[in-house]
Amino acid sequence: MKVNQITPISFTYKSPLKTEWLKGNMPSVTHGIYGGILTKDNITLEHIKPHSKGGKTSLKNLALAVDENNFKRGSKPIWQFLTKEMFEQYIEQFKNIFLPDFNGKEYAENLTKTVERLLKK
């Protein structure tokens, strides 16, 4: 009997947001959603609506964050960590980014809708 090795399948989501940033294609994006300077060593994807509370892993619900700030928030409500000024500074960084796999203006508009919905609750 011949036994074939099974190759594991990765279900890791590859967000164009983080991927393009890591490639250096977003030089205007220097700060995470909660502030802090982004580096290749500390960048992480933040779920605006926590994954543990039903938040989807999609661009409409993801932001770049400094890992330490992301971990501090955990699954606590976004309004405990994000001020209006912080959010406006974050999305402003994306408004002139137009890449084949990423439209910064569209991203900023969709993320704004997500944050506004969560703040109404």
Give the location of each predicted region:
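Non-Sec secretion/translocation targeting segments of pathogen effectors
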Residues: 1-13, 17-19
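Generic short amphipathic/hydrophobic targeting helices enriched at N-termini
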Residues: 2-5, 25, 111
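Short Cys/His-rich Zn2+-coordinating modules
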Residues: 14-23, 45-52
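Short cysteine-rich loop/turn motifs with clustered Cys
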Residues: 20-43, 66
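Histidine-centered nuclease catalytic patch
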Residues: 35-64, 73, 78
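A detector for short metal-coordination/catalytic motifs
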Residues: 60-61, 68-121
